[in-house]
Protein backbone atom coordinates (compact mmCIF):
# COMPACT_ATOMS: atom_id res chain seq x y z
CA UNK A 1 0.00 0.00 0.00
CA UNK A 2 0.97 3.62 -0.34
CA UNK A 3 2.60 4.38 2.99
CA UNK A 4 3.46 7.78 4.42
CA UNK A 5 6.22 8.35 6.96
CA UNK A 6 5.40 11.17 9.38
CA UNK A 7 8.03 13.41 10.98
CA UNK A 8 7.50 15.95 13.71
CA UNK A 9 10.30 18.33 14.69
CA UNK A 10 10.60 20.95 17.40
CA UNK A 11 8.14 21.88 20.11
CA UNK A 12 5.36 23.10 17.83
CA UNK A 13 5.78 20.22 15.38
CA UNK A 14 5.61 17.66 18.17
CA UNK A 15 2.55 19.16 19.80
CA UNK A 16 0.66 19.47 16.52
CA UNK A 17 1.86 16.04 15.43
CA UNK A 18 0.80 14.34 18.66
CA UNK A 19 -2.66 15.89 18.34
CA UNK A 20 -2.82 14.58 14.77
CA UNK A 21 -2.09 11.03 15.96
CA UNK A 22 -4.76 11.42 18.62
CA UNK A 23 -7.39 12.24 15.96
CA UNK A 24 -6.06 9.56 13.61
CA UNK A 25 -6.12 6.81 16.24
CA UNK A 26 -9.63 7.81 17.20
CA UNK A 27 -10.83 7.63 13.58
CA UNK A 28 -9.21 4.25 12.99
CA UNK A 29 -10.31 2.71 16.28
CA UNK A 30 -6.82 2.30 17.73
CA UNK A 31 -6.54 2.65 21.51
CA UNK A 32 -3.63 4.28 23.36
CA UNK A 33 -1.70 1.02 23.43
CA UNK A 34 -1.99 0.33 19.72
CA UNK A 35 -4.77 -2.28 19.94
CA UNK A 36 -7.65 -2.19 17.48
CA UNK A 37 -10.98 -1.58 19.22
CA UNK A 38 -12.94 -0.27 16.24
CA UNK A 39 -16.14 -1.58 14.73
CA UNK A 40 -15.93 -0.98 11.00
CA UNK A 41 -13.91 -2.78 8.32
CA UNK A 42 -13.26 0.56 6.64
CA UNK A 43 -11.08 1.54 9.58
CA UNK A 44 -8.64 -1.26 8.81
CA UNK A 45 -8.89 -1.28 5.02
CA UNK A 46 -5.99 1.12 4.48
CA UNK A 47 -4.65 1.45 7.99
CA UNK A 48 -1.14 0.59 6.84
CA UNK A 49 -0.77 3.98 5.16
CA UNK A 50 0.06 5.47 8.56
CA UNK A 51 0.45 2.46 10.87
CA UNK A 52 2.77 -0.49 10.89
CA UNK A 53 1.33 -3.76 12.16
CA UNK A 54 3.67 -5.13 14.83
CA UNK A 55 3.58 -8.47 16.63
CA UNK A 56 0.48 -9.25 18.66
CA UNK A 57 -1.74 -7.23 16.30
CA UNK A 58 -0.47 -3.94 17.66
CA UNK A 59 -0.58 -0.94 15.35
CA UNK A 60 2.39 1.41 15.59
CA UNK A 61 2.43 4.85 13.93
CA UNK A 62 5.03 5.37 11.20
CA UNK A 63 6.13 8.47 13.07
CA UNK A 64 9.56 9.86 13.88
CA UNK A 65 9.67 12.39 16.73
CA UNK A 66 12.61 14.79 16.74
CA UNK A 67 13.63 17.63 19.04
CA UNK A 68 16.84 19.23 20.24
CA UNK A 69 15.70 19.24 23.85
CA UNK A 70 14.00 16.50 25.84
CA UNK A 71 11.08 18.53 27.27
CA UNK A 72 8.35 18.09 24.66
CA UNK A 73 9.32 14.46 24.10
CA UNK A 74 9.02 13.70 27.79
CA UNK A 75 5.53 15.13 27.94
CA UNK A 76 4.50 13.14 24.84
CA UNK A 77 5.96 10.00 26.35
CA UNK A 78 4.24 10.47 29.68
CA UNK A 79 1.01 11.66 28.02
CA UNK A 80 -1.93 9.47 27.00
CA UNK A 81 -0.35 8.54 23.64
CA UNK A 82 3.03 7.62 25.13
CA UNK A 83 2.50 3.89 24.70
CA UNK A 84 1.50 4.23 21.05
CA UNK A 85 4.80 5.35 19.50
CA UNK A 86 7.79 3.14 18.97
CA UNK A 87 10.32 4.01 21.70
CA UNK A 88 13.28 3.93 19.26
CA UNK A 89 11.60 6.61 17.14
CA UNK A 90 12.08 9.34 19.74
CA UNK A 91 15.30 11.12 18.73
CA UNK A 92 16.35 14.10 20.81
CA UNK A 93 19.35 16.17 21.85
CA UNK A 94 19.93 17.90 25.16
CA UNK A 95 21.08 21.39 24.31
CA UNK A 96 18.09 22.95 22.50
CA UNK A 97 18.33 25.35 19.57
CA UNK A 98 17.28 28.45 21.48
CA UNK A 99 15.07 29.71 18.62
CA UNK A 100 18.19 30.01 16.51
CA UNK A 101 17.79 28.70 12.96
CA UNK A 102 21.56 28.36 12.52
CA UNK A 103 21.78 26.06 15.55
CA UNK A 104 19.07 23.82 14.16
CA UNK A 105 20.41 23.80 10.61
CA UNK A 106 24.19 23.92 10.98
CA UNK A 107 25.44 23.05 14.46
CA UNK A 108 23.26 21.27 17.03
CA UNK A 109 20.79 19.92 14.46
CA UNK A 110 23.52 18.76 12.09
CA UNK A 111 25.01 16.62 14.86
CA UNK A 112 21.72 14.84 15.45
CA UNK A 113 20.59 14.57 11.84
CA UNK A 114 22.34 11.27 11.04
CA UNK A 115 20.68 9.40 13.87
CA UNK A 116 17.31 10.78 12.72
CA UNK A 117 17.99 9.64 9.16
CA UNK A 118 18.79 6.13 10.43
CA UNK A 119 15.34 5.94 12.04
CA UNK A 120 13.69 7.35 8.89
CA UNK A 121 15.52 4.77 6.77
CA UNK A 122 14.26 2.00 9.04
CA UNK A 123 10.69 3.26 8.71
CA UNK A 124 11.03 3.60 4.92
CA UNK A 125 12.36 0.04 4.64
CA UNK A 126 9.29 -1.18 6.53
CA UNK A 127 7.07 0.11 3.71
CA UNK A 128 5.95 -1.92 0.70
CA UNK A 129 5.46 1.09 -1.50
CA UNK A 130 6.47 4.36 0.15
CA UNK A 131 4.38 7.25 -1.14
CA UNK A 132 6.20 10.05 0.60
CA UNK A 133 6.87 11.96 3.78
CA UNK A 134 4.95 14.53 5.76
CA UNK A 135 6.50 16.81 8.34
CA UNK A 136 4.90 19.04 10.97
CA UNK A 137 7.02 21.96 12.17
CA UNK A 138 6.95 25.70 12.79
CA UNK A 139 9.00 28.18 10.77
CA UNK A 140 9.62 30.69 13.54
CA UNK A 141 11.85 28.71 15.91
CA UNK A 142 15.18 26.94 15.79
CA UNK A 143 14.54 23.19 15.75
CA UNK A 144 11.37 22.93 13.65
CA UNK A 145 12.57 25.58 11.22
CA UNK A 146 16.32 25.00 11.10
CA UNK A 147 16.57 21.28 11.70
CA UNK A 148 13.22 20.62 10.01
CA UNK A 149 14.44 22.13 6.74
CA UNK A 150 17.77 20.31 7.11
CA UNK A 151 15.90 17.00 7.38
CA UNK A 152 13.74 17.89 4.39
CA UNK A 153 16.79 18.53 2.23
CA UNK A 154 18.53 15.34 3.41
CA UNK A 155 15.40 13.26 2.73
CA UNK A 156 15.13 14.94 -0.67
CA UNK A 157 18.68 13.80 -1.46
CA UNK A 158 18.02 10.24 -0.42
CA UNK A 159 14.48 9.83 -1.79
CA UNK A 160 14.32 12.29 -4.71
CA UNK A 161 11.23 10.72 -6.31
CA UNK A 162 9.05 10.58 -3.19
CA UNK A 163 6.54 13.27 -2.26
CA UNK A 164 7.39 15.74 0.49
CA UNK A 165 4.44 17.45 2.16
CA UNK A 166 4.95 19.90 5.01
CA UNK A 167 2.46 21.31 7.51
CA UNK A 168 4.24 24.52 8.40
CA UNK A 169 3.12 26.89 11.14
CA UNK A 170 4.11 30.41 10.09
CA UNK A 171 4.91 33.14 12.59
CA UNK A 172 2.20 35.75 12.82
CA UNK A 173 2.45 39.38 13.90
CA UNK A 174 0.00 39.27 16.81
CA UNK A 175 1.15 35.98 18.28
CA UNK A 176 4.89 36.34 18.46
CA UNK A 177 7.07 34.02 20.41
CA UNK A 178 10.53 35.46 19.69
CA UNK A 179 11.95 38.55 18.11
CA UNK A 180 14.00 36.67 15.48
CA UNK A 181 11.00 34.88 13.93
CA UNK A 182 11.27 36.84 10.63
CA UNK A 183 14.88 35.65 10.20
CA UNK A 184 14.03 32.02 10.94
CA UNK A 185 10.94 32.08 8.72
CA UNK A 186 12.72 33.68 5.74
CA UNK A 187 15.59 31.20 5.93
CA UNK A 188 13.06 28.35 6.13
CA UNK A 189 10.89 29.49 3.20
CA UNK A 190 14.12 29.78 1.19
CA UNK A 191 14.57 26.02 1.79
CA UNK A 192 10.92 25.02 1.35
CA UNK A 193 10.65 26.72 -2.05
CA UNK A 194 13.36 24.38 -3.32
CA UNK A 195 12.76 21.15 -1.41
CA UNK A 196 9.08 20.72 -0.58
CA UNK A 197 6.40 19.51 -3.01
CA UNK A 198 3.44 20.88 -1.10
CA UNK A 199 3.40 23.12 1.95
CA UNK A 200 0.22 23.65 3.93
CA UNK A 201 0.60 27.07 5.54
CA UNK A 202 -1.03 27.54 8.91
CA UNK A 203 -0.67 30.54 11.15
CA UNK A 204 -1.46 31.12 14.77
CA UNK A 205 -3.16 34.46 14.26
CA UNK A 206 -5.73 32.95 11.91
CA UNK A 207 -6.27 30.06 14.34
CA UNK A 208 -6.84 32.51 17.21
CA UNK A 209 -9.35 34.44 15.10
CA UNK A 210 -11.28 31.25 14.36
CA UNK A 211 -11.29 30.38 18.08
CA UNK A 212 -12.55 33.82 19.11
CA UNK A 213 -14.98 34.62 16.32
CA UNK A 214 -16.33 31.30 15.11
CA UNK A 215 -15.94 28.97 18.07
CA UNK A 216 -16.65 31.77 20.59
CA UNK A 217 -13.90 30.66 22.97
CA UNK A 218 -12.87 33.31 25.50
CA UNK A 219 -9.37 32.08 26.23
CA UNK A 220 -8.17 29.65 23.56
CA UNK A 221 -5.22 27.48 24.55
CA UNK A 222 -2.55 25.99 22.29
CA UNK A 223 -4.50 22.75 22.69
CA UNK A 224 -7.48 24.38 20.93
CA UNK A 225 -5.25 25.70 18.13
CA UNK A 226 -3.60 22.31 17.66
CA UNK A 227 -7.01 20.69 17.53
CA UNK A 228 -7.96 22.93 14.58
CA UNK A 229 -4.74 22.03 12.78
CA UNK A 230 -5.35 18.33 13.39
CA UNK A 231 -8.84 18.62 11.85
CA UNK A 232 -7.27 19.93 8.66
CA UNK A 233 -4.47 17.35 8.67
CA UNK A 234 -7.01 14.61 9.18
CA UNK A 235 -9.14 16.04 6.35
CA UNK A 236 -6.26 16.41 3.91
CA UNK A 237 -5.21 12.81 4.49
CA UNK A 238 -8.73 11.28 4.53
CA UNK A 239 -8.60 10.09 0.96
CA UNK A 240 -5.32 8.34 1.64
CA UNK A 241 -6.58 6.48 4.71
CA UNK A 242 -10.10 5.36 3.88
CA UNK A 243 -11.64 3.64 0.88
CA UNK A 244 -13.75 6.25 -0.89
CA UNK A 245 -15.30 7.07 -4.23
CA UNK A 246 -12.79 9.60 -5.41
CA UNK A 247 -9.44 8.80 -3.93
CA UNK A 248 -6.55 11.11 -4.01
CA UNK A 249 -2.97 10.78 -2.83
CA UNK A 250 -0.16 13.24 -2.16
CA UNK A 251 1.04 13.06 -5.76
CA UNK A 252 -2.40 13.52 -7.32
CA UNK A 253 -2.97 16.45 -5.01
CA UNK A 254 0.29 18.05 -6.15
CA UNK A 255 -0.42 17.42 -9.84
CA UNK A 256 -3.78 19.15 -9.52
CA UNK A 257 -2.67 21.95 -7.23
CA UNK A 258 0.78 23.08 -8.34
CA UNK A 259 0.75 24.89 -11.69
CA UNK A 260 4.35 26.10 -11.33
CA UNK A 261 6.89 24.22 -9.23
CA UNK A 262 7.80 27.07 -6.88
CA UNK A 263 4.20 28.03 -6.13
CA UNK A 264 3.30 25.16 -3.83
CA UNK A 265 2.19 27.05 -0.70
CA UNK A 266 -1.44 26.27 0.11
CA UNK A 267 -3.92 27.79 2.49
CA UNK A 268 -6.28 25.43 4.25
CA UNK A 269 -9.73 25.60 5.80
CA UNK A 270 -12.19 23.27 7.49
CA UNK A 271 -15.95 23.34 7.79
CA UNK A 272 -18.34 23.05 9.64
CA UNK A 273 -16.94 24.96 12.59
CA UNK A 274 -19.58 26.05 15.10
CA UNK A 275 -19.57 27.27 18.67
CA UNK A 276 -20.05 24.43 21.16
CA UNK A 277 -23.58 25.29 22.27
CA UNK A 278 -25.07 26.19 18.91
CA UNK A 279 -24.52 22.96 16.96
CA UNK A 280 -27.97 21.63 17.71
CA UNK A 281 -29.63 24.71 16.23
CA UNK A 282 -28.56 24.18 12.67
CA UNK A 283 -28.73 21.48 10.04
CA UNK A 284 -25.44 21.19 8.20
CA UNK A 285 -26.08 21.26 4.45
CA UNK A 286 -23.68 20.96 1.54
CA UNK A 287 -24.25 24.57 0.37
CA UNK A 288 -23.64 25.80 3.89
CA UNK A 289 -20.39 23.96 4.52
CA UNK A 290 -19.10 24.80 1.04
CA UNK A 291 -19.84 28.46 1.67
CA UNK A 292 -18.08 28.34 5.03
CA UNK A 293 -15.08 26.47 3.65
CA UNK A 294 -14.42 29.16 1.03
CA UNK A 295 -14.92 32.00 3.49
CA UNK A 296 -11.63 33.75 4.24
CA UNK A 297 -12.59 34.05 7.93
CA UNK A 298 -12.29 30.29 8.03
CA UNK A 299 -8.86 30.05 6.47
CA UNK A 300 -6.13 28.93 8.79
CA UNK A 301 -3.74 31.33 7.07
CA UNK A 302 -4.05 35.03 7.92
CA UNK A 303 -4.68 36.60 4.53
CA UNK A 304 -7.77 37.72 2.67
CA UNK A 305 -8.56 35.44 -0.26
CA UNK A 306 -10.74 38.13 -1.84
CA UNK A 307 -7.64 40.21 -2.53
CA UNK A 308 -5.96 37.48 -4.54
CA UNK A 309 -7.03 34.90 -7.10
CA UNK A 310 -7.14 31.14 -6.87
CA UNK A 311 -4.75 29.39 -9.23
CA UNK A 312 -6.22 26.05 -8.14
CA UNK A 313 -8.14 24.64 -5.21
CA UNK A 314 -9.42 21.35 -3.89
CA UNK A 315 -12.28 20.39 -1.60
CA UNK A 316 -12.40 17.05 0.19
CA UNK A 317 -15.90 16.12 1.33
CA UNK A 318 -16.46 13.54 4.04
CA UNK A 319 -19.67 11.77 4.96
CA UNK A 320 -22.70 10.57 3.03
CA UNK A 321 -22.90 13.33 0.46
CA UNK A 322 -24.24 13.13 -3.05
CA UNK A 323 -21.50 13.86 -5.56
CA UNK A 324 -23.99 15.63 -7.78
CA UNK A 325 -24.83 18.14 -5.03
CA UNK A 326 -21.14 18.66 -4.40
CA UNK A 327 -20.37 19.25 -8.09
CA UNK A 328 -23.33 21.65 -8.42
CA UNK A 329 -22.23 23.58 -5.35
CA UNK A 330 -18.67 23.91 -6.58
CA UNK A 331 -19.88 25.00 -10.02
CA UNK A 332 -22.20 27.62 -8.65
CA UNK A 333 -19.54 28.95 -6.30
CA UNK A 334 -17.11 29.32 -9.20
CA UNK A 335 -19.67 31.10 -11.34
CA UNK A 336 -20.66 33.47 -8.55
CA UNK A 337 -17.08 34.35 -7.70
CA UNK A 338 -15.51 33.94 -11.11
CA UNK A 339 -13.20 36.93 -10.60
CA UNK A 340 -11.52 35.08 -7.73
CA UNK A 341 -10.32 32.29 -10.04
CA UNK A 342 -7.72 32.74 -12.78
CA UNK A 343 -9.38 32.14 -16.12
CA UNK A 344 -6.32 30.65 -17.80
CA UNK A 345 -6.58 27.39 -15.83
CA UNK A 346 -9.95 25.87 -16.73
CA UNK A 347 -11.42 23.27 -14.32
CA UNK A 348 -9.12 24.42 -11.56
CA UNK A 349 -11.30 23.11 -8.72
CA UNK A 350 -10.84 19.50 -7.74
CA UNK A 351 -13.20 17.56 -5.48
CA UNK A 352 -12.74 14.25 -3.73
CA UNK A 353 -15.07 12.38 -1.47
CA UNK A 354 -14.86 9.83 1.31
CA UNK A 355 -17.81 8.11 3.00
CA UNK A 356 -16.53 8.26 6.55
CA UNK A 357 -17.16 11.54 8.39
CA UNK A 358 -15.03 12.76 11.30
CA UNK A 359 -16.20 11.89 14.81
CA UNK A 360 -19.30 13.77 15.89
CA UNK A 361 -20.16 15.16 12.44
CA UNK A 362 -22.50 13.97 9.68
CA UNK A 363 -20.43 15.61 6.98
CA UNK A 364 -17.46 17.92 6.67
CA UNK A 365 -15.30 19.52 4.03
CA UNK A 366 -11.60 20.31 4.02
CA UNK A 367 -10.54 23.08 1.72
CA UNK A 368 -7.08 23.48 0.14
CA UNK A 369 -6.41 26.56 -1.95
CA UNK A 370 -3.44 27.72 -3.97
CA UNK A 371 -4.22 31.42 -3.96
CA UNK A 372 -2.04 34.37 -4.89
CA UNK A 373 -3.31 36.07 -1.70
CA UNK A 374 -0.76 34.05 0.26
CA UNK A 375 1.83 36.60 -0.83
CA UNK A 376 0.47 38.81 1.99
CA UNK A 377 1.91 36.40 4.52
CA UNK A 378 5.29 36.39 2.79
CA UNK A 379 5.24 40.19 2.42
CA UNK A 380 4.66 40.56 6.14
CA UNK A 381 7.63 38.33 6.92
CA UNK A 382 9.81 40.04 4.30
CA UNK A 383 9.09 43.52 5.69
CA UNK A 384 9.98 42.48 9.22
CA UNK A 385 13.07 40.70 7.93
CA UNK A 386 14.41 43.70 6.05
CA UNK A 387 13.70 46.09 8.92
CA UNK A 388 16.01 44.07 11.17
CA UNK A 389 18.52 43.01 8.52
CA UNK A 390 19.11 46.63 7.43
CA UNK A 391 20.52 47.29 10.89
CA UNK A 392 22.07 43.82 11.15
CA UNK A 393 20.16 43.35 14.40
CA UNK A 394 20.62 39.99 16.17
CA UNK A 395 22.83 38.82 13.32
CA UNK A 396 25.72 37.82 15.60
CA UNK A 397 23.67 34.90 16.94
CA UNK A 398 23.67 33.43 13.45
CA UNK A 399 27.17 34.35 12.28
CA UNK A 400 28.47 32.94 15.57
CA UNK A 401 27.19 29.53 14.45
CA UNK A 402 29.14 29.85 11.21
CA UNK A 403 26.52 31.40 8.94
CA UNK A 404 27.39 34.01 6.35
CA UNK A 405 25.52 37.27 5.73
CA UNK A 406 25.38 36.24 2.10
CA UNK A 407 22.95 33.48 3.01
CA UNK A 408 20.57 36.03 4.52
CA UNK A 409 20.74 38.16 1.38
CA UNK A 410 20.03 35.12 -0.81
CA UNK A 411 17.09 34.03 1.34
CA UNK A 412 15.65 37.54 1.24
CA UNK A 413 15.86 37.79 -2.54
CA UNK A 414 14.37 34.32 -2.97
CA UNK A 415 11.41 35.40 -0.82
CA UNK A 416 11.02 38.60 -2.87
CA UNK A 417 11.09 36.53 -6.08
CA UNK A 418 8.37 34.26 -4.71
CA UNK A 419 6.18 37.28 -3.88
CA UNK A 420 6.78 38.69 -7.38
CA UNK A 421 5.85 35.37 -9.01
CA UNK A 422 2.56 35.22 -7.14
CA UNK A 423 1.85 38.82 -8.16
CA UNK A 424 2.71 38.08 -11.80
CA UNK A 425 0.19 35.25 -12.04
CA UNK A 426 -2.42 37.25 -10.15
CA UNK A 427 -2.21 40.01 -12.77
CA UNK A 428 -2.00 37.62 -15.73
CA UNK A 429 -5.08 37.26 -17.88
CA UNK A 430 -5.90 34.68 -20.53
CA UNK A 431 -5.03 37.24 -23.20
CA UNK A 432 -1.40 37.68 -22.15
CA UNK A 433 0.53 35.48 -24.49
CA UNK A 434 3.96 36.31 -23.18
CA UNK A 435 3.46 34.85 -19.74
CA UNK A 436 4.24 31.37 -20.94
CA UNK A 437 7.32 32.70 -22.69
CA UNK A 438 8.53 34.46 -19.56
CA UNK A 439 8.01 31.32 -17.58
CA UNK A 440 9.99 29.16 -20.01
CA UNK A 441 12.89 31.62 -19.93
CA UNK A 442 12.88 31.45 -16.14
CA UNK A 443 12.98 27.66 -16.31
CA UNK A 444 15.96 27.72 -18.68
CA UNK A 445 17.82 30.11 -16.40
CA UNK A 446 17.23 27.82 -13.45
CA UNK A 447 18.51 24.79 -15.34
CA UNK A 448 21.67 26.51 -16.51
Curated annotation (Swiss-Prot):
Belongs to the tubulin family. Tubulin is the major constituent of microtubules, a cylinder consisting of laterally associated linear protofilaments composed of alpha- and beta-tubulin heterodimers. Microtubules grow by the addition of GTP-tubulin dimers to the microtubule end, where a stabilizing cap forms. Below the cap, tubulin dimers are in GDP-bound state, owing to GTPase activity of alpha-tubulin. Pfam families: Tubulin (PF00091), Tubulin_C (PF03953). The keyword Nucleotide-binding applies. CDD domains: beta_tubulin. InterPro entries: Beta-tubulin_BS (IPR013838), Beta_tubulin (IPR002453), Tub_FtsZ_C (IPR008280), Tubulin (IPR000217), Tubulin/FtsZ-like_C (IPR037103), Tubulin/FtsZ_2-layer-sand-dom (IPR018316), Tubulin/FtsZ_GTPase_sf (IPR036525), Tubulin_C (IPR023123). GO terms for cellular component: cytoplasm; microtubule. This is Tubulin beta chain. GTP binds at residues 11, 69, 138, 142-144, 204, 226. Its cofactor is Mg(2+). Mg(2+) binds at residue 69. Keywords: Cytoplasm, Cytoskeleton, GTP-binding, Magnesium, Metal-binding, Microtubule, Nucleotide-binding. It is found in: Cytoplasm, Cytoskeleton. GO terms for biological process: microtubule cytoskeleton organization; mitotic cell cycle. Dimer of alpha and beta chains. A typical microtubule is a hollow water-filled tube with an outer diameter of 25 nm and an inner diameter of 15 nM. Alpha-beta heterodimers associate head-to-tail to form protofilaments running lengthwise along the microtubule wall with the beta-tubulin subunit facing the microtubule plus end conferring a structural polarity. Microtubules usually have 13 protofilaments but different protofilament numbers can be found in some organisms and specialized cells. One of its GO terms (molecular function) is GTPase activity. It comes from Mycosarcoma maydis.
